[in-house]
Amino acid sequence: MAKNFIWGPDGRLPHIEDHTKRKLEVLKSYLDIYFDTVVRNPAQDRLNITLVDGFSGGGAYADGAETRSGSPLVLLSAVEQAAVRLNERREKPLKINARFIFVDDEFEHVAALRRELKSRDYAEDDPRITIYHGTFVDHLPAILQKITKTQIKGRSIFFLDQFGYSDVPMSAIRTIFNSLDRSEVVLNFAIDSLLNYLQDASAELELYRQFGVDARFISDWKQRKDEKMGRALTQRALMAHIHANSGAKFFTPFMLWSRTDNRWMMLAHLSQHQAARDKMLGVHWQKQNSFTHAGPGGLFNLGYDARLKESCDSFFSFSEIDRTKLSRELINALPSEIHRIMHGGQLEIGRLLAEIGNRTAGTNEDIFEVLSELAQARELEVLSSIGRPKRAGTKISIKDRLILPSQPTLFFSKKF
Ligand SMILES: C[S@@+](CC[C@H](N)C(=O)[O-])C[C@H]1O[C@@H](n2cnc3c(N)ncnc32)[C@H](O)[C@@H]1O
């Protein structure tokens, strides 16, 4: 086992690595945005949610002379802080009714986690916290049963921080999404470890086949000429397979560079709802994700795209320069996309977001701004949810609808 993740009986904490810090920061930022946006209705007085940490570890790390929270404590404190923050602005108090399920298959890690919780004044029999010793997959049926028994919509976040890529089968993720409507998964996946150790024989193994790795995939990977581009394209192909085989509608990769191992790790966010993906995308921009996918940020497709081999310089990252580029790309790409989905009638903005959500690095706000520009340029007309025309320049919302302008315009007449 990697020595940076060993919690022994002597109580010594493992030293935290930079990429682990970053991973936990991403998790924390995501949870903050999640809670800040999930309860929109001021009349709502309760939020039921279960947070599952399927690979919880021992709860804390050493960072020089300081102690740093591990993922179980990040989950607990994110909920405690959200409860305070959200109630500051509310007349009707909101209760976050959260349950926590922590799983680890190392007995010593479970013991360390219990010690850590106790030292932070969580009672051993705290009814909100369940700790399982054993593998995540073995405990998954009991976890799902626990959630569905009391939560109709199954609002839950699964943080699945495996070491490599073999402890969370795609079938487990499909089971989560099939069982719980409002579930989200944040999956750690050692994407470069998988690629670096691929052998011809891997194509025969179900472990690899579940990620779409077959003989053709392996031979394309081995024959790569340009290391950076070949790796980026193969990572992309793998992401597309993981997305397709996970049963999730939305997929957002967040790349973390491990200096110790000299390789990329992927933290993927998987969800069934566009709003959830939009929240994760907000974290990408905030944290300047080092996911440099090949190609434009405006509209793209994950998955292998041979044409990108010719455009080695077109890597996209989440910088301010890219944000400007992204707006320009969206201005050019959206009209034809809207026309394609619209089929001549009206198009709800919510549907547009759901259609293009996986294929853009733009957040909903970025897309609203571009739509607003297109409306001001009379390329589009915007109707409110009750069908009233909106003045160009007014704020656009997810419930609005788009129609083509009565007069043909530059974009639409040029393209169709
Ligand atoms: C990367 S560490 C987790 C770190 C922790 N999530 C954090 O951020 O503080 C992975 C943990 O998963 C545990 N583990 C390994 N295989 C497992 C499995 N199949 N099911 C559950 N836990 C497992 C290990 O014992 C280890 O504590």
Model-derived segments and spans:
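Class I SAM-dependent methyltransferase Rossmann-like catalytic core
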Residues: 2-46, 64
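SAM cofactor-binding core of SAM-dependent methyltransferases
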Residues: 31-142, 362-369, 373
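Short amphipathic alpha-helix with an adjacent loop that forms part of the alpha/beta core around
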Residues: 139-151, 174
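A short, conserved alpha-helix within the catalytic core of class I
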Residues: 165-175
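Conserved beta-strand signature within the Rossmann-like core of class I S-adenosyl-L-methionine
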Residues: 181-193
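A conserved mid-domain beta-alpha-beta active-site/ligand-binding segment of alpha/beta enzyme cores
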Residues: 201-259
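Conserved beta strand-loop-helix elements of the APE1-like EEP
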Residues: 266-276
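C-terminal target-recognition/interaction regions appended to catalytic cores
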Residues: 283-416
